[in-house]
């Protein structure tokens, strides 16, 4: 993958990038680098979401769960991983818990 900056001709003062081709693009996503997220980790995380959807329903988790309950499960999975248990993807389940807490910080801040 080529460095994205080599395509940028100049930075426009109105929050746009202007490319050598003349194309313009807003800079509103410049602080978020989704291209840096590991595709391997993301696949593992998606499998945890799929497993949960099969067991509890597609969006059951979005109804909300107490943070201490999520942390307890995440810590349990982390400890199992530390003990060498590879019977399930414990690290992806820890990541799921952290993603859920971050989601609830925005959607259910009083939990």
Description of each model-found segment:
Residues 1-111:
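Intrinsically disordered, low-complexity regulatory regions
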């Amino acid at each position: 993958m080529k460095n994205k900056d080599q395509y940028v001709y100049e930075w426009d003062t109105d929050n746009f990038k202007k490319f050598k081709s003349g194309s313009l693009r807003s800079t509103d996503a410049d602080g978020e680098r989704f291209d840096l997220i590991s595709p391997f980790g993301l696949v593992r995380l998606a499998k945890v979401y799929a497993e949960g959807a099969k067991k509890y329903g597609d969006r059951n988790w979005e109804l909300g769960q107490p943070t201490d309950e999520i942390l307890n499960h995440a810590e349990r999975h982390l400890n199992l991983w530390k003990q060498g248990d590879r019977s399930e993807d414990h690290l992806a389940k820890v990541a799921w818990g952290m993603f859920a807490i971050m989601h609830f910080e925005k959607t259910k801040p009083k939990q």
